[in-house]
Regions:
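Generic serine detector
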Residues: 2, 8, 50, 70, ...
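Acidic, proline/glycine-rich low-complexity IDRs
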Residues: 90-148
Length: 148
């Protein structure tokens, strides 16, 4: 089981900062970092789901994430100005949480892409799922370029 989280150039630094500076991020994401978030091959991978988090993730939130959903459609998430730290960290946290729920249900692999919607000034998460497979070499190369 694994979750691969990749990010656009505009979002990658929030993913990196969340893993590198856990004390600077909200408690919800800090809990995720403490339960198995690691860096591998240019992506961020969660190797095991957190039972506590699975129980706390409402079904309505899961239903909201169909293909492409922006964070401002979720009632529990306070929408902040684009580029503010809590807002972007929350996007990462919700992406990880959603991936955990899919893993628990399917025992497969989930890819989560975080991006910025310039027109709506909101974070966007796109999800795909399927059987586990290592990241494609082209994807890793692309991540290396945007993170450099």
């Amino acid at each position: 089981m694994s979750v691969a989280i990749t990010a656009s150039a505009g979002m990658q630094r929030w993913v990196d900062d969340a893993a590198e500076f856990p004390r600077a991020v909200p408690a919800r994401l800090r809990m995720l970092l403490d339960t198995g978030l690691v860096h591998e091959a240019g992506g961020t991978y969660l190797e095991r789901p957190s039972a506590e988090l699975l129980e706390r993730m409402p079904a309505a939130e899961l239903e909201a994430f169909v293909n492409r959903v922006s964070l401002d459609t979720l009632k529990p998430v306070q929408r902040l100005e684009r580029g503010s730290e809590p807002w972007c960290y929350e996007a990462v946290a919700i992406g990880i949480a959603f991936g955990e729920r899919v893993l628990a249900a399917s025992a497969g692999h989930v890819s989560i892409v975080l991006d910025l919607d310039e027109e709506r000034s909101s974070c966007v998460l796109r999800f795909t799922s399927g059987p586990w497979a290592p990241p494609h070499p082209d994807e890793v190369d692309w991540l290396g370029m945007v993170r450099g």
